[in-house]
Amino acid sequence: MIRNLIFLGAPGSGKGSTALEISTKYDIEHISTGEIFRNEIKNKTPLGLKVAEIVNDGKYVPDELTNQIVLKKLKELKQENKKFILDGYPRTLNQAMFLSSVLDEKILAVLLEVPTNLIIERLSFRRICPICKSIYHLKYNPSKKGEFCENHLENLTKIEARQDDSEESIKKRLKIYNEETKPMIDYYKKNQSLVVINSEESVKKVASLVIKKVFND
C-alpha cells in the first residue's frame, strides 16, 4: 500500500536523494522544503531574502514560516488526491505536532542514520546542478564531464557547492539537529510510526531497504 512518508535524518544522511529515488519509482510527490526555500532565495522574493539571512547564519527557518509553506503545498496535493514524501520537514517537535494536526491519516516517518564523520565528508564534497538539481560527489560520484553537469549536452552547466555546505555551516547545522530534531524522533517512536534505516550505503541500496520495510516490495 502506498502511504504518505516523512524522511528524517541529519543533513547529509541522504534524505533528498533517497526520497527522489522512491518518489520516481512510485510516482509520489516529493516535497523538499529546502528546495522550495532555495528557489525563493534564487528568485530574491521577500521570503527568499528572509530565508537567505537565516540559512547563511547556519540556522533553520522558524517553525511558523515553514509550517505555512508546507500546509499550502499539502492542500494542493489533497485536491489532486496525491500521496507525498516530505523531505526536510518536520525538523522540530512543534512542526511534527502541527503536521499531525492537519493530516487526515497517520504518516510514517523514515529515519536515515549515518555517522557524523561520513556526513561531513558527504556534504563537503557534494556538488549540485543548479538547473536539473542532479547531485554529484567529487570522490564517490563525480560528473563524467568534470566540473559540468552530465545532463546538458548543448549548454555546459557548471555544478556547484551549496552555500550551506561549508564545514563551518555543516557543524552548526548538526548541532542544531541534535538539539531540535531528536526530540521529534522520540515523538514518532512513541506513536509507533518510525522506521529506522542505516544510510551508510549507496542511494540505491538505501532506497531498496526503505522499499522493503515500508512497501513490502
Swiss-Prot record:
It catalyses: AMP + ATP = 2 ADP. AMP binds at T33, R38, K59, Y60, V61, G88, Y89, P90, R91, Q95, R162, R173. Residues 125-165 are annotated as: LID. One of its GO terms (cellular component) is cytoplasm. InterPro entries: Adenyl_kin_sub (IPR006259), Adenylat/UMP-CMP_kin (IPR000850), Adenylat_kinase_CS (IPR033690), Adenylate_kinase_lid-dom (IPR007862), P-loop_NTPase (IPR027417). It is found in: Cytoplasm. Its main location: cytoplasm. GO terms for biological process: AMP salvage. GO terms for molecular function: adenylate kinase activity; ATP binding. It is an enzyme of class 2 (transferase). Its EC number is 2.7.4.3. Pathway: Purine metabolism; AMP biosynthesis via salvage pathway; AMP from ADP: step 1/1. The keyword Phosphoprotein does not apply. Pfam families: ADK, ADK_lid. Residues 32-61 are annotated as: NMP. The keyword RNA-binding does not apply. ATP binds at G12, S13, G14, K15, G16, S17, R126, I135, Y136, E201. Keywords: ATP-binding, Cytoplasm, Kinase, Nucleotide biosynthesis, Nucleotide-binding, Transferase. Belongs to the adenylate kinase family. Consists of three domains, a large central CORE domain and two small peripheral domains, NMPbind and LID, which undergo movements during catalysis. The LID domain closes over the site of phosphoryl transfer upon ATP binding. Assembling and dissambling the active center during each catalytic cycle provides an effective means to prevent ATP hydrolysis. Monomer. Catalyzes the reversible transfer of the terminal phosphate group between ATP and AMP. Plays an important role in cellular energy homeostasis and in adenine nucleotide metabolism. This is Adenylate kinase. It comes from Mycoplasma mobile (strain ATCC 43663 / 163K / NCTC 11711). The gene is adk.
